[in-house]
């Protein structure tokens, strides 16, 4: 079976969804700029060899509708001969795009793919046009479609306190801020034109949503956002609302080597799994276990882990049940996570994978895991191995 490898991986800065730097920039533009960047950064690649562009996006309507993958690839100048498809596995969409490309490569259905994802949550809100079938109430609780309440449920089941959540959120902002000022995020960010608060055109090079001023004291003053009476989950311990895109160049290993391209990581294994929709945030646990089993590995074999921070109340139970409580500061989300950077739904899977690969290079790590929960009860996971 052929081997799928990551040749390059980049992301946009994360813009604040409410009146942020990308308020006048469309989702197709964020996507196209990254597609163009991958071709610029890898001049050995003949764009005519691109088999398919596979792009994750959740709210596929308005500017994100009518197959945004194709719209963006045409904007980027990718040859018309390349295909393009938009995929939707909710929060796991761009990681699913990676899995689709990897499976195609492994089975000989192409050797060069651009994958990624986007979500402009400022232009197309997360709940825009959502209309659940009434019959779902016979199968799952109505609250299962309310992500904050599922986090409350999962946190309560695992005894996660408000104080633990606040501490986890502070850590996310502190580490993301440190990664910014120390230049570590600069390795993965591709600058995008946006507008400052006065409307002036600027080149955005850093994430807008990180709040370095966040403290335990400031978070303690926030009210519960989803269950006002008995809740513990606040806006401060939830992933920020942000706009962004991420992208990867995925190739068959021998093809990449023949072109003299640097191979940054191999895809060692992949998995998706389902769980109860009422605790959708638990999905990374079964997905991770399945991916590790397929790779013949254990949790202890992993050097670094990126666990998407949908909510602190969701992340901490996953850490607990994967047996990672004692290695959080050595292995997990070393540059912060979605609580600080935001979770543009269709973007995040490739975003956390990009951050992971850069951290693996920085730490000279061999094995890494990227995993995330998915609304309505799923998880997705990818094990990467540095060559």
From Swiss-Prot:
Coiled coil stretches, renumbered: none
Keywords: Acyltransferase, Cytoplasm, Fatty acid metabolism, Lipid degradation, Lipid metabolism, Transferase
Reaction equations catalysed: an acyl-CoA + acetyl-CoA = a 3-oxoacyl-CoA + CoA
GO CC aspect terms: cytoplasm
GO biological process, one term: phenylacetate catabolic process
GO molecular function terms noted in the UniProt entry: acetyl-CoA C-acyltransferase activity
Main location as per UniProt: cytoplasm
Subcellular location: Cytoplasm
Active site: 91, 343, 373
NCBIfam families tied to this protein: AcCoA-C-Actrans, fadA, PRK08947.1
Protein name: 3-ketoacyl-CoA thiolase
Protein species of origin: Shewanella frigidimarina (strain NCIMB 400)
